Design a protein with these regions (language model features):
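Extreme N-terminal leader/targeting segments of oxidoreductases
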Residues: 2-95
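Short, well-ordered alpha-helices that flank and scaffold nucleotide-derived cofactor binding pockets
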Residues: 24, 111, 115, 213
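A conserved short coil-to-beta-strand element within the FAD-binding core of flavoproteins
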Residues: 37-42, 224-239
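Conserved N-terminal/central alpha/beta ligand/cofactor-binding core
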Residues: 48-52, 137-222, 226-227
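N-terminal Rossmann-like FAD-binding beta1-loop-alpha1 element of flavoenzymes
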Residues: 92-128
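Core beta-strand elements of the Rossmann-like FAD/NAD(P) dinucleotide-binding domain
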Residues: 93, 247-256, 260
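Short acidic, glycine/serine/threonine-rich loops at helix termini
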Residues: 132-137, 171-172, 233-243
Length: 260
């Protein structure tokens, strides 16, 4: 698989134009391109009289990739695939790991642990997305704040109501894993290649709900309106957490706590 960077095309260009430009960059007949996938698409509008699209693409070609690379310029490189595979954990404890918070970190921790078969218990002080949306609407319309379920607390975390702009200043290759999981759970497909990916608050609610459903389907449990008030520690080891849920108090036994 080869990656071609910075293919510049007019705003009127279509998929065939992109394939032809990719063939030109590789210095081979476009018919030798078996597959082409856009990994980034941006608009260059620095010159108002010359606005164009800029693409990065990954292509699978018919031929010797090393030979093709030798005759191409610096804009072509071999794709460095980074697949996120959680390390194998040989866990002997029969206690469920507890995740505190169901924002972005809690959701992806829950997904990873549930897929690994650990059936995590997730505690979230706020409400699930359906009730949380009602609480937020009440605050915006009537200025009545629910201190436990609002734009900050609740399923999905603060990002659920931040319009879903996916920007980061880091180049961590695992960002691709996050983007793909969001798309797999209902976010627009174009976030996979857009230079400024954007989900939108309406679609984010669906994504968050679908992640919750997968975790539960794999044996995980999510307790909403349930606040962790303390960690139980004895002899330097975690033995559990203390929780409060609508005036009811419970000690949950665990030896693993993720503060998310």
């Amino acid at each position: 698989m080869l990656k071609i960077n910075q293919i510049k095309l007019p705003l009127t260009a279509d998929e065939h134009d992109l394939r032809r430009a990719a063939g030109k960059a590789l210095r081979l007949d476009e018919n030798r391109i078996r597959t082409l996938r856009v990994t980034k698409k941006a608009v260059d509008s620095r010159k108002k009289d010359n606005i164009f699209f800029v693409y990065n693409v990954e292509v699978d070609v018919d031929g010797d990739e090393n030979a093709i690379l030798k005759r191409c310029g610096s804009g072509v490189e071999t794709v460095k695939k980074v697949d996120f595979t959680p390390p194998e954990v040989k866990r002997t404890s029969e206690l469920r790991p507890v995740i505190v918070g169901f924002g972005p970190a809690g959701m992806f921790s829950g997904l990873a642990l549930a897929r690994a078969g650990f059936k995590p218990l997730i505690l979230e002080r706020g409400s699930h997305i359906e009730d949380r949306q009602k609480d937020v609407q009440t605050f915006w319309r009537e200025r009545r704040l629910n201190p436990e379920s609002n734009v900050q607390f609740g399923e999905g975390g603060a990002g659920t109501f931040s319009d879903g702009k996916l920007t980061t200043g880091i180049k961590d290759p695992l960002c691709r894993f996050v983007i793909d999981e969001l798309a797999n759970h209902g976010a627009p497909e174009e976030i996979r290649w857009s230079a400024k990916p954007h989900i939108g608050t309406d679609r984010l609610a669906e994504v968050v709900r679908n992640i919750r459903k997968e975790i539960i389907s794999l044996g995980g449990e999510i307790r909403f309106n349930c606040k962790m008030t303390d960690i139980i520690v004895a002899n330097g080891y975690i033995h559990g957490v203390k929780t409060e849920n609508d005036g009811h108090f419970e000690d949950i036994e665990t030896d693993t706590v993720l503060l998310c």
